[in-house]
C-alpha cells in the first residue's frame, strides 16, 4: 500500500480586543487555505465559549482556562494536519506563549485598532455596555489586554 506523507498542520492564532477583526481574518485565511485544498478549521472564541467553555466566566482563571481549552483543540487539529485559525481575545501573554510552546507550528497574529475605532465598530454593543457599567471585566475597558511583545504578524 502506497501511503502519502502526512501533511503538517499549523495554528494561526488571531489575538486582539473585541471588534479588531480576528474572526473576519480567521475566516478569510481558512477559506484561502480551503481553496488550495488544505484542510482548515476556524475556532471562534465566542462560539467556543457557548459550547466547550460554557459555564466559564471572565475572571483571570476562567479566561486562562478558556484559552487553554482552545489551545488544546488547536494542538490536536494541528497534529492531524489541519490548518487551524483561532480567533480568540486571549488577553494574557503568558497563556498565549504557553499555547505556542504546546503547539509548535504556530503563528501569532495581533489584530489591533485604536480604542475609538473599536468602540465605533462595536458590532455586539459590548463597549457601550461596558462603558455603561452593564458588563464587568471587559477586555480593554476594565480588564487588561497584554499586547504581544513580538507577534509574527500585526494587522
What are these regions, as identified by a protein language model?
Residues 1-12, 36-39:
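Extreme N-terminal, non-catalytic leader segments
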Residues 112-115, 120-155:
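Small-molecule kinase domains that catalyze NTP-dependent phosphoryl transfer to phosphate-bearing small molecules
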Amino acid at each position: 500500500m502506497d501511503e502519502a506523507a502526512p501533511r503538517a498542520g499549523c495554528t494561526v492564532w488571531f489575538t486582539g480586543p473585541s471588534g479588531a477583526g480576528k474572526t473576519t481574518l480567521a475566516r478569510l485565511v481558512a477559506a484561502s487555505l480551503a481553496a488550495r485544498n488544505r484542510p482548515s478549521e476556524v475556532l471562534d472564541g465566542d462560539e467556543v465559549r457557548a459550547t466547550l467553555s460554557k459555564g466559564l466566566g471572565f475572571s483571570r482563571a476562567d479566561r486562562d482556562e478558556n484559552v487553554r481549552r482552545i489551545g488544546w483543540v488547536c494542538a490536536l487539529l494541528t497534529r492531524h494536519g489541519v490548518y487551524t485559525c483561532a480567533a480568540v481575545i486571549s488577553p494574557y501573554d503568558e497563556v498565549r506563549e504557553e499555547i505556542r510552546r504546546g503547539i509548535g507550528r504556530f503563528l501569532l497574529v495581533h489584530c489591533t485598532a485604536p480604542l475609538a475605532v473599536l468602540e465605533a465598530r462595536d458590532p455586539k454593543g459590548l463597549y457601550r455596555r461596558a462603558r455603561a457599567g452593564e458588563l464587568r471585566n471587559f477586555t480593554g475597558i476594565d480588564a487588561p489586554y497584554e499586547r504581544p511583545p513580538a507577534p509574527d504578524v500585526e494587522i
